[in-house]
């Protein structure tokens, strides 16, 4: 029997507001434990929540960017459960009237475009953070308690772990472009749970789903889903039944491990939040928020292709992250040619960032520095080979490209007399290469050019070297 995989994703995104959703407590990441909390966050008796309007604006902005319909009437509800990181024993969330519904995004997998539906986007408060010491007790930090977040629930339209990965990449990109969140998984501002089930091909009814947690990266999401897909298939083929349960992905064993039997929504005993009135969002408010949405990745990608003449692949890679795209924009604003700027960002810059495991913001490279270097290449002041030395200096120490070239004596040698001397020495020292070239071995020219570049420490002008070299060989 062949099965079809059905995947749905629940993504939690912390909103980048200055204060929490129902209190004035600050939200910056990295503060000492339990220094960014208040009696409201901790649920002391007699305190009342006050809704943060900016959190509502940010949630609407995210929902609109994801093509959701924005509710006119929305409300908050209590989601009741006990856990040490939840001091009130309930979480203020949204149940039956979310702020956004019926959205979608488009992903590309293996050259094909697919639309993934978004069931809903709702506002809620985050919980605290538990740290398990391994000594029989756990520590709790309530700094995160009450931080505003949106939960984005996809339709069960995803059919492969690869599609799940592509969906998360696209969702993260869109949210980052709106500016409502930095989406840093390492800081917990983006978290994902995955639901997966299998059903016989052709059947409409869904199979029993399993929820996956402890997915600390998009790669873990994909790996966890791949393992769970195989596990469920083996269970079903052997005549077993899939239990509705929550499992976690363990990177060490590369398996999913049972955490608990999954609870249903009824177990949370949702009821309307009595301390908050229903929220009315009129058309004027919606339009103000809509007008604040910046250019999104798909729009920017189209502009790069249509207006800047970039290949579709370049445009796609450059717009994957807002940081890279903004850097590219600033670089061409400084006068760099678009394709050259794209080549450097996709090539040397990306290679350096991957190797050093850094973000662009963690380096000394500036758009002005990169643009200056590209212009020096275009003018013939430096060669592409020398440019790599300049680039290393720019990204590690910063500075001005022209100044670096002058101080380090990296100006390209374009003087014909100096180049003729280098060519003559190379020919005198390698007579066999001359014979090889005359006998049809074109690689001999490459060898001679290499000798000249080595002698000039990479500073000889390659096109001029080739020209003079061919002329001098003819004379011999």
Swiss-Prot record:
Keyword set includes Cell division: no
Disulfide bonds: none
UniProt cross-references to InterPro entries, sorted A to Z: Asn/Gln-tRNA_amidoTrfase_suB/E, Asn/Gln-tRNA_Trfase_suB/E_cat, Asn/Gln_amidotransferase, Asn/Gln_tRNA_amidoTrase-B-like, GatB, GatB_C_1, GatB_Yqey_C_2, Gln-tRNA_amidoTrfase_suB_CS
Catalysed reactions, as listed in the record: L-glutamyl-tRNA(Gln) + L-glutamine + ATP + H2O = L-glutaminyl-tRNA(Gln) + L-glutamate + ADP + phosphate + H(+); L-aspartyl-tRNA(Asn) + L-glutamine + ATP + H2O = L-asparaginyl-tRNA(Asn) + L-glutamate + ADP + phosphate + 2 H(+)
TM spans (from-to): none
Key words, A-Z: ATP-binding, Ligase, Nucleotide-binding, Protein biosynthesis
Pfam families documented for this protein: GatB_N, GatB_Yqey
GO biological process, one term: translation
GO molecular function: asparaginyl-tRNA synthase (glutamine-hydrolyzing) activity; ATP binding; glutaminyl-tRNA synthase (glutamine-hydrolyzing) activity
Enzyme Commission identifier(s): 6.3.5.-
Assembly notes: Heterotrimer of A, B and C subunits.
Function, as annotated: Allows the formation of correctly charged Asn-tRNA(Asn) or Gln-tRNA(Gln) through the transamidation of misacylated Asp-tRNA(Asn) or Glu-tRNA(Gln) in organisms which lack either or both of asparaginyl-tRNA or glutaminyl-tRNA synthetases. The reaction takes place in the presence of glutamine and ATP through an activated phospho-Asp-tRNA(Asn) or phospho-Glu-tRNA(Gln).
PANTHER family: GLUTAMYL-TRNA GLN AMIDOTRANSFERASE SUBUNIT B MITOCHONDRIAL AND PROKARYOTIC PET112-RELATED (PTHR11659), GLUTAMYL-TRNA(GLN) AMIDOTRANSFERASE SUBUNIT B, MITOCHONDRIAL (PTHR11659:SF0)
Family: Belongs to the GatB/GatE family. GatB subfamily.
Name of this protein: Aspartyl/glutamyl-tRNA(Asn/Gln) amidotransferase subunit B
Species in which this protein is naturally found: Bacillus pumilus (strain SAFR-032)
